[in-house]
Amino acid sequence: MKQIFLHTSLAAMALAVTTTGAAPERCDGTVQLTSQSNFQVRQAGTQTFVQFDFTGLHDICLADRSVVTGIVEGHLVQRISANGDFSLTFDEVLSYNGGTLGYRGEGSLTGGNWQSNVMTVGLGTGPLAGIHGQGTFVFTGPASLADVIYYVYTP
């Protein structure tokens, strides 16, 4: 399922590039989680599963090259192994100036190797309509992340 979603997202981004002729533009941003709720922990053998809802702040680059901060609400699920390896998935909706844009991401730490992927989901609304992006993220603290997302802007 993850592979189908990834291929669909890549195809949508490629279509956006082909349609507009625009190359993806790099956007360096941050995410700061400001609250967590509905915190749940479940043990299954040597695996620990943690999930919670969150709110926070997330930078996004607009088509005019301005960087603005939106409010995000989302849900995160994390699996932690006894050896310290873990994986996580999240879905969030960013709200800014009356518009919304969905994001979906996943990351994993295996043997000290961090891999991540984040992408926009859907068409966006209001001032966030027509924004498509894909990139990576890293944790910079317990509730903060840095991301690099390449955006394509379609009319």
Could you say what each language-model-derived stretch is?
Residues 8-16:
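Bacterial N-terminal signal peptides
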Residues 16, 21-24:
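Boundary at the C-terminal end of the N-terminal hydrophobic targeting segment
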Residues 23-155:
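Beta-strand-enriched cores of mature, soluble protein domains
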Residues 1-9:
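Bacterial N-terminal signal peptides that target proteins for export
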